[in-house]
């Protein structure tokens, strides 16, 4: 099995917010034992959903739960800079396109009880890949192996992928950056996700500052992943 190492800087960053994510983990546990497959999304890019996904998965693993973190943001992966491999790895897109077995894409990490499915190479048809039978087949195969499965999805305000993924999940969490996104866009994102049939578990207000007084704005639906990837 391929092994990934979480980079030291990311591990130190997660340590600083450990208590915060331990509290979120506890709230998830109290929400019900049936809530074990969770989609994490945001309205747009740069709000911290990938960091939230990683930190939550770390918290669950460190609490003794066998946890799988899936990088399903195949258009614009942030986790590729969080976990490093010594050699060539296969990821989610390889499996969804029929070019890898499930066992080929689940990677061990240097964190006990935490495994990761990398995103893989950027595909020409991300949404179509998620809609084929392989994604649900994967979830069915792994749901009884892990205590928790955390799926980092693309922003629901930019592409529909997150709702497709959430359809196979028990619940979803919406991450939003304080002072950046207008409330009505957050509410619209929540409604879009709920249409998938997945349960709304809550909103994480990220990057909070005492100076924040209003919500911002956003746009560019459909252009996600086509801009300079260095922005994220």
Swiss-Prot record:
It holds the Pfam family AAA_31. It is an enzyme of class 2 (transferase). It comes from the Bacteria. One of its GO terms (biological process) is capsule polysaccharide biosynthetic process. Keywords: ATP-binding, Capsule biogenesis/degradation, Exopolysaccharide synthesis, Kinase, Nucleotide-binding, Phosphoprotein, Transferase, Tyrosine-protein kinase. Belongs to the CpsD/CapB family. This is Tyrosine-protein kinase CpsD. It comes from Streptococcus agalactiae serotype Ia (strain ATCC 27591 / A909 / CDC SS700). The lineage of its organism: Bacteria, Bacillati, Bacillota, Bacilli, Lactobacillales. The gene is cpsD.
């Amino acid at each position: 099995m391929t092994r990934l190492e979480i980079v030291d800087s990311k591990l130190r960053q997660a340590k600083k917010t450990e208590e915060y994510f331990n509290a979120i983990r506890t709230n998830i546990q109290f929400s019900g034992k049936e809530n074990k497959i969770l989609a994490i999304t945001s309205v747009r890019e740069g709000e911290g959903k990938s960091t939230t996904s990683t930190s939550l998965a770390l918290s669950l693993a460190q609490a003794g739960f066998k946890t799988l973190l899936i990088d399903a943001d195949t258009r614009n992966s942030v986790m590729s800079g969080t976990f490093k491999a010594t050699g060539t790895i296969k990821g989610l897109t390889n499996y969804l396109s029929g070019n890898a077995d499930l066992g080929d894409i689940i990677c061990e990490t240097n964190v006990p009880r935490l495994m990761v499915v990398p995103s893989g190479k950027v595909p020409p048809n991300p949404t179509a890949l998620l809609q084929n039978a392989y994604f649900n087949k994967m979830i069915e195969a792994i749901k009884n192996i892990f205590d928790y499965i955390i799926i980092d999805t693309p922003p629901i305000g930019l592409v529909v992928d997150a709702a497709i993924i959430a359809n196979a999940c028990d619940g979803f969490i919406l991450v939003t950056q304080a002072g950046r996104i207008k409330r009505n866009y957050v509410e619209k994102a929540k409604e879009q996700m709920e249409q998938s049939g997945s349960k709304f578990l809550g909103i994480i207000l990220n990057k909070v500052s005492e100076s924040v007084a209003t919500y911002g704005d956003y746009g560019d639906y459909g252009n996600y992943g086509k801009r300079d990837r260095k922005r994220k």
